[in-house]
């Protein structure tokens, strides 16, 4: 079974890591639209256009499923992608909320949702959380985290100052990492909150969804991974080596 994974940049590698670790597919084709990252500040029509263009790329590979590992795309373009596809298209927002619910948190818990302007502004997370009984919601756009990750700043004073800028005086019970770039700095986020907040990671949420809702089971063979980028593929390959720890066979074409 072959899966396509699409993101605006390198952040979707966090979803790829979870998919590889659980062995849900025989092959994963990853495309990062690094020439046009970030999608977060773009308007809805632009995000839809970029997403449909990326979807055309995957038609060259006869994928069985497409995972939009970008919250901005999941917030604004998921229906357009589904109507234009002959295969299932899975977003990251609903799996993230369901993963939170599966943690068994008290409905009165404060839920902090962080993401790009496009994701937070769409209100999709807030709406779904309320539908699942969570009303103590703080949704906060944290766009600076995206270029920080793209610049491979995973620790140090720049990241620490940005964490302070966004999170000063906040004390959430759980945090939904509403951008697939953010798990690359999840250790720093967890440390900032003294490891007291439950973190919901899109990659693990997608795995839960694929297993429970679609019945996809682990394969016995080691999955293969092909990496593609619209610009600077060597940077994508470098970050993949860091994040995936060279644990899997990767080919960058």
UniProtKB/Swiss-Prot annotation:
- Is Cell wall biogenesis/degradation among this UniProt entry's keywords? yes
Indicate the residues that form the catalytic site.
70, 179
Q: What is its EC number?
A: 5.1.1.3
Q: Which Pfam families match?
A: Asp_Glu_race
Q: What pathway does the UniProt record associate with this protein? A: Cell wall biogenesis; peptidoglycan biosynthesis
* GO molecular function annotation: glutamate racemase activity
Name the Gene Ontology biological process terms.
cell wall organization; peptidoglycan biosynthetic process; regulation of cell shape
Q: Where does substrate bind?
A: 7-8, 39-40, 71-72, 180-181
Q: Which UniProt keywords apply?
A: Cell shape, Cell wall biogenesis/degradation, Isomerase, Peptidoglycan synthesis
Q: Which domain of life is it from?
A: Bacteria
Q: Which reaction does it catalyse?
A: L-glutamate = D-glutamate
Which InterPro entries does its entry note?
Asp/Glu/hydantoin_racemase, Asp/Glu_race, Asp/Glu_racemase_AS_2, Glu_race
Q: What function does the entry list?
A: Provides the (R)-glutamate required for cell wall biosynthesis.
Q: What family is reported?
A: Belongs to the aspartate/glutamate racemases family.
UniProt protein name: Glutamate racemase
């Amino acid at each position: 079974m072959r899966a396509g994974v699409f993101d605006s940049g390198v952040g979707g590698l966090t979803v790829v890591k979870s998919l590889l670790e659980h062995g849900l597919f025989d092959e994963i084709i990853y495309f990062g639209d690094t020439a046009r990252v970030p999608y977060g500040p773009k308007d809805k029509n632009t995000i839809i256009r970029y997403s449909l263009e990326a979807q055309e790329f995957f038609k060259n590979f006869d994928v069985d499923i497409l995972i939009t590992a970008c919250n901005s795309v999941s917030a604004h373009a998921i229906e357009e992608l589904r109507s234009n596809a002959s295969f299932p298209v899975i977003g990251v927002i609903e799996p993230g909320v369901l993963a939170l619910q599966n943690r068994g948190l008290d409905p009165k818990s404060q839920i902090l949702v962080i993401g790009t302007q496009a994701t937070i502004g769409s209100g999709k997370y807030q709406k779904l959380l309320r539908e699942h009984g969570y009303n103590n919601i703080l949704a906060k756009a944290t766009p600076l985290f995206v270029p920080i990750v793209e610049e491979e700043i995973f620790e140090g004073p720049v990241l620490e100052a940005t964490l302070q800028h966004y999170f000063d005086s906040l004390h959430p019970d759980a945090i939904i990492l509403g951008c697939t770039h953010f798990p690359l700095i999840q250790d720093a986020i967890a440390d900032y909150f003294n490891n007291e907040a439950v973190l919901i990671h899109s990659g693990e949420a997608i795995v839960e969804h694929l297993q429970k809702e679609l019945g996809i089971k682990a394969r016995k063979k080691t999955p293969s991974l092909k990496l593609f980028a619209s610009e600077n593929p060597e940077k994508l390959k470098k970050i993949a080596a860091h994040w995936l720890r060279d644990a899997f066979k990767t080919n960058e074409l």
